[in-house]
C-alpha cells in the first residue's frame, strides 16, 4: 500500500510513519469486514455512520492533514467500492460517480461531501486476520493500478453541483470553487491559530501548474479529445513560469496540402458579354494555356482580344539587333580596301606635320607678332587701305552755338548738412553707421541711399562743369532717373522710361508718361521776343528721397533727404547772347519732323475715308463726305510751323502736296 500515499507528504518522515500505521489498521479492519460481511451487515452500517461523523469532525479540526494528502484514498473506501454488487442497494451514497464529471457551481453555497475518508480506528480483529490480508488479491491489482493513474481528487467533488457537464464549465466557476475552499479553510484555521504566511499560501493556491495531476480527471474519461481541443488551453491562462499564453508562438497553417488546381476548376471563367465558358479560350497573351479549336465565343470578346494584343505589341520594347561576330569574308572589294589604307596613311602624315610645325614655332621665338600674323593670314590690297576714323568732338552744346558767339557760365555748388562742400575729402554717415556722402578734392561726389545703394554721382565733364546722374534704389542694374549737366542740357525720365522734362540752352518742354508734350517754354533771358508763354517753375519727385527743382535756367538743383541727412547739388547755367536776334526761333524742329507730321495728317484722312465707306456703302454718299475739322486745323498749324522754322522751299512744297493730295 506504499504506492497509494499522497505525493504532498514526502517531505515529513513522521507523518509518513503515521500514515503507514493508519493504513495498516484500516487494512485490518477492512479484512475483518470482508470475512464477516454476510453475518454482520448491521455492524458495518453503524461503522459507516461512525466513519462519516469522524470525517466531518476531522475536516473541521484537522485541516492541515487534509492539505497534506488531498488525493489519498482510504483502503476501507476502496474495498467498499470493489464490492459494488453487494452494496449497491444498501449504500447508494458510497457509489463512486465515475461516469460523468460535473462543473463547480458559481454559487458560494457549501455542499457537504457525500464521500468520507477513513480515519484511525482501533481494530478489534485478531492479528491472524491481519496477516492473512496484507496484500490485494490479484483480481483487484489491475483496478488498483487504474485508480492510481487516474488520481481522482475527491475534494473537488464537494462543491460540485450535479447535472452540470464539463462542456458548460467555465474558468470563473472553477476559480470561484478554489476561492471558496480557501476562504472556508481560512476561517477554520483562524479559530485555532494564526497562520505563519497566509499570503504565500494563497498565491500558491491561485497558481495553476499545467502538469498537475488534478487536471487529469477532466480528460481521463470519455471526452478526452473534446477537452484537449476546447478546454485545456483555457485552463492554462495563469502560467507560473514564462510569458502569457497570448504571446505564445502559433504556427501558421500550411498550404502544402491544398490543391489549388481543383479550386480553379470548380470556378471556371465566364464571358462577360455572352456568359459562355472561357476554358477553351486561347489568347496570344497567355502563352501557358493550351491551344483550342476556336479563339473566342462572341464578336465583342474577339474585339477585346484584338485590342489587348495591339496594345501589347505597342508597349513591347523593340528587339535588340545583335551584331554577327562569326568569321566572315572581307567586306568590299580590294580597291576599296586600298583606298582606306591610303587615307589612313595620309592622316598619319598630316598629324606628323602638325607636330613638326608646333616644334618649329616654339623654337623661333625671335619672330615678332606681326611676322607671325603675316605668315598665318592672307592679306588683300583693299584690306590694307583702312579709312581713318573721324574724331567726333564730345560737345554738349546745341547746334546753334556753332555759328554764334555765346558764353556759358556754369553755376555749380554743393551743400551737405547745411554746409557748403568745397574741393576737399569729406565723408558723412547715417545714424545707423552706413555711408551717406563722400566728396573728393576734384569735385566728384557720391550720395548713397540708406540701403547702401548709390543714389547720385557727380563727376566733371570733358568741356566745362559737372554732370550729375541719378539712379533708382536697386543693388544691381539700376535705372537712370535723371541726367543733369551744368553746361545747359538736362533730362529727367518717368519710371516707364519716357522723357519727363527736357532742357537745353534755349528752353525746354514738359511731357506726360505716354510721351505727349504738355507744355514748352523759352528762357526769358535768351530770346527777347518769343511766341511762347513765360516760364513757370517745375518741381519733380523722382522717388521718395530725390527731387528736382527748376526755377530758372541758372537755378536748377537736385535735393536729397533721407533719415535726417540732407544734400543739395546745383546744376544751373547762365547764357549770354550778344545779339539775340541772330538766333532763329525754334530752329531745333528739323525738316524731317515736319514731313512726318504731314504724313500723319494724310494717314488720318485715309482712315476717315475708310470709315465712311464702311458706314455708307453707296458710292453717291462718298462725294458728299467732308474732311473733319480737326484735320483741317492740324494742316493750318503745320503750315504755320513750317514758315516759322525757316525750312527750305522745296520741303515746304512737298509738305503742301502731301496735305492737299486728293484721296
From Swiss-Prot:
Family: Belongs to the ERICH6 family.
Acidic residues composition-biased segments: 20-69
Compartments, as annotated in UniProt: Nucleus
Protein's UniProt name: Glutamate-rich protein 6
Disordered: region residues: 1-74, 106-136
Primary localization: nucleus
Pfam families linked to this entry: FAM194 (PF14977)
Gene Ontology annotations for the cellular component aspect, listed alphabetically: nucleus
Nucleus found in the keyword field: yes
Keyword terms: Nucleus
Biased composition (Low complexity): 112-132
Amino acid at each position: 500500500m506504499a504506492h497509494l500515499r499522497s505525493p504532498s507528504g514526502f517531505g515529513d518522515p513522521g507523518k509518513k510513519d503515521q500514515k503507514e500505521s493508519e493504513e495498516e489498521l484500516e487494512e485490518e479492519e477492512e479484512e475483518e469486514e470482508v470475512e464477516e460481511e454476510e453475518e454482520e451487515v448491521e455492524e458495518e452500517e453503524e461503522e459507516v455512520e461512525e466513519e462519516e461523523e469522524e470525517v466531518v469532525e476531522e475536516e473541521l479540526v484537522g485541516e492541515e492533514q487534509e492539505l497534506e494528502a488531498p488525493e489519498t484514498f482510504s483502503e476501507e473506501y476502496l474495498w467498499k467500492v470493489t464490492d459494488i454488487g453487494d452494496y449497491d442497494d444498501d449504500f447508494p451514497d458510497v457509489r463512486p460517480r465515475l461516469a460523468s464529471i460535473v462543473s463547480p457551481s458559481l454559487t458560494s453555497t457549501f455542499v457537504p461531501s457525500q464521500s468520507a475518508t477513513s480515519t484511525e480506528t482501533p481494530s478489534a480483529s485478531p492479528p491472524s486476520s491481519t496477516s492473512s490480508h496484507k496484500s490485494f488479491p490479484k483480481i483487484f491489482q489491475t483496478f488498483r493500478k487504474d485508480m492510481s493513474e487516474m488520481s481522482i481528487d475527491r475534494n473537488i467533488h464537494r462543491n460540485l453541483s450535479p447535472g452540470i457537464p464539463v462542456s458548460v464549465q467555465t474558468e470563473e466557476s472553477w476559480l470561484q470553487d478554489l476561492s471558496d475552499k480557501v476562504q472556508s479553510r481560512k476561517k477554520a484555521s483562524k479559530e485555532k491559530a494564526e497562520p505563519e504566511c497566509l499570503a504565500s499560501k494563497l498565491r500558491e493556491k491561485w497558481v495553476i501548474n499545467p502538469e498537475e495531476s488534478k487536471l487529469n480527471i477532466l480528460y481521463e474519461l470519455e471526452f478526452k479529445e473534446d477537452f484537449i481541443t476546447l478546454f485545456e488551453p483555457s485552463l492554462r491562462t495563469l502560467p507560473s513560469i514564462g510569458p502569457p499564453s497570448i504571446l505564445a508562438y502559433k504556427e501558421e497553417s500550411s498550404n502544402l496540402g491544398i490543391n489549388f488546381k481543383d479550386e480553379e476548376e470548380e470556378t471556371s471563367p465566364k464571358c462577360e458579354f455572352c456568359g459562355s465558358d472561357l476554358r477553351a479560350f486561347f489568347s496570344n497573351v497567355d502563352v501557358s494555356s493550351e491551344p483550342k479549336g476556336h479563339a473566342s465565343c462572341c464578336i465583342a470578346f474577339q474585339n477585346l482580344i484584338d485590342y489587348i494584343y495591339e496594345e501589347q505589341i505597342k508597349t513591347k520594347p523593340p528587339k535588340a539587333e545583335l551584331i554577327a561576330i562569326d568569321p566572315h569574308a572581307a567586306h568590299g572589294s580590294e580597291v576599296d580596301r586600298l583606298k582606306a589604307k591610303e587615307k589612313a596613311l595620309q592622316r598619319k602624315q598630316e598629324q606628323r606635320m602638325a607636330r613638326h610645325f608646333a616644334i618649329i614655332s616654339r623654337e623661333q621665338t625671335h619672330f615678332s607678332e606681326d611676322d607671325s600674323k603675316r605668315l598665318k593670314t592672307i592679306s588683300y590690297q583693299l584690306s590694307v587701305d583702312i579709312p581713318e576714323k573721324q574724331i567726333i568732338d564730345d560737345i554738349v552744346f546745341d547746334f546753334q552755338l556753332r555759328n554764334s558767339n555765346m558764353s556759358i557760365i556754369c553755376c555749380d555748388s554743393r551743400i551737405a548738412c547745411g554746409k557748403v562742400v568745397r574741393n576737399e575729402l569729406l565723408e558723412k554717415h547715417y545714424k545707423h553707421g552706413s555711408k551717406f556722402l563722400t566728396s573728393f578734392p576734384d569735385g566728384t561726389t557720391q550720395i548713397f541711399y540708406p540701403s547702401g545703394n548709390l543714389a547720385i554721382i557727380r563727376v566733371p565733364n570733358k568741356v566745362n562743369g559737372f554732370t550729375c546722374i541719378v539712379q533708382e534704389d536697386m543693388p544691381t542694374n539700376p535705372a537712370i532717373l535723371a541726367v543733369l549737366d551744368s553746361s545747359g542740357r538736362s533730362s529727367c525720365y518717368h519710371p516707364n522710361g519716357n522723357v519727363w522734362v527736357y532742357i537745353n540752352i534755349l528752353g525746354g518742354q514738359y511731357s506726360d508718361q505716354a510721351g505727349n508734350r504738355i507744355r514748352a517754354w523759352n528762357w526769358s533771358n535768351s530770346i527777347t521776343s518769343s511766341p511762347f508763354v513765360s516760364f513757370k517753375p517745375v518741381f519733380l519727385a523722382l522717388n521718395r528721397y530725390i527731387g528736382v527743382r527748376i526755377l530758372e535756367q541758372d537755378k536748377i538743383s537736385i535735393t536729397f533727404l533721407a533719415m535726417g541727412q540732407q544734400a543739395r547739388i546745383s546744376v544751373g547755367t547762365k547764357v549770354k547772347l550778344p545779339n539775340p536776334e541772330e538766333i532763329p526761333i525754334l530752329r531745333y524742329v528739323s525738316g524731317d519732323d515736319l514731313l512726318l507730321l504731314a504724313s500723319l495728317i494724310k494717314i488720318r484722312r485715309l482712315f476717315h475715308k475708310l470709315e465712311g465707306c464702311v458706314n455708307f456703302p453707296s458710292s453717291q454718299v462718298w462725294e458728299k463726305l467732308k474732311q473733319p475739322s480737326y484735320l483741317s486745323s492740324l494742316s493750318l498749324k503745320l503750315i504755320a510751323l513750317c514758315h516759322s522754322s525757316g525750312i527750305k522751299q522745296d520741303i515746304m512744297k512737298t509738305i503742301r502736296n502731301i496735305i492737299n493730295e486728293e484721296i
